[in-house]
Amino acid sequence: SFFDDALSAGPFEFLIAIGFSFEYLLTNLLFVPFMSGASFNGDLPTMTFGFSAQSDESRHMTLGLEAIKFLLEQDEANVPIVQAWIDKWFWRGYRVTALVAQMLDYMLPRKVMSWKEAFELYFEEQMLGGLFQDLAFYGIRPPMHVDDAIAEKEILSHQVYWTLYQFSHAAAFTTTVPDADAQNWLSENYTETFDQLYRPLWDKEAKNIEAGGRHFVRGLPQLCQVCQVPMLFTEPGDPTTLCQRESVYNGEKFQTCSNGCQWIFEREPEKYVQAWLPVHQIYQGN
């Protein structure tokens, strides 16, 4: 849905979507830490592809940043317009990185960097501490809902992988219970959350498997109307309560997964009510 959203936007918003959100935010967190993990695990073809792609992305980032500056320099009235696009496309790109988070923490046989560490380095230090310091000259502030993203760095990968594990029959992902070494690594990297919230889930699942009964969730998950990711995320500041936002448009109710996605939906409801949600289509028999 990310690219459908970008391609159906105007040309200048498209520049922000691709040059900022995709080339800068998303690919930094995919092609650098995950491809380093591929290299560390001996997957040289993936590493070669990833680092080659990232060299292209570096040039694209430069182009995207200059395009943003050009728009801002033309007229002061452009600042709130560009700011709103940055707010929107930051959150759209960030939600896509949820898959990268669980890939780093759970799917690499040998771990090289946690999602939390990658997020702190490539987003908090380099983007918030670098890019947005430059853009502050033009009146641009850090994206709306950035605090929600920072608060999720301790829990994001665990929530996503646990959901994929339960819906492996639908997602066609190979998922397994992390072994003792992997769980100890997660405990060391997520000292505030893993042992308290997620190790008990895996301990319980290990007992299920020993008894011959790995569990799956029967049925399919509710999808967010905007990002189309399953509604698996939790309330900001409360990792034990699922986050679900409801908006009404033309008498019909629509569900979103977060404050960010609800804000995006309510800015352009006439666009997002048209979303083609796979789970809805499956239940309709299409």
Locate each region found by the language model.
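Non-heme di-metal
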Residues: 1-223, 230, 237
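Residues immediately within or flanking Cys/His clusters that coordinate Zn2+
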Residues: 221-224, 244, 251-254
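Short, intrinsically disordered terminal segments enriched in charged and Pro/Gly residues
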Residues: 265, 273-281, 285
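Cys/His-coordinated zinc-binding microdomains
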Residues: 228, 258
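Short recognition patches in nucleic-acid-associated and regulatory proteins
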Residues: 230-248
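Soluble, non-membrane globular domain cores that form compact, hydrophobic packing
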Residues: 218, 227, 245, 281-285
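Cys/His-rich microdomains that often coordinate metals
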Residues: 231, 261, 265
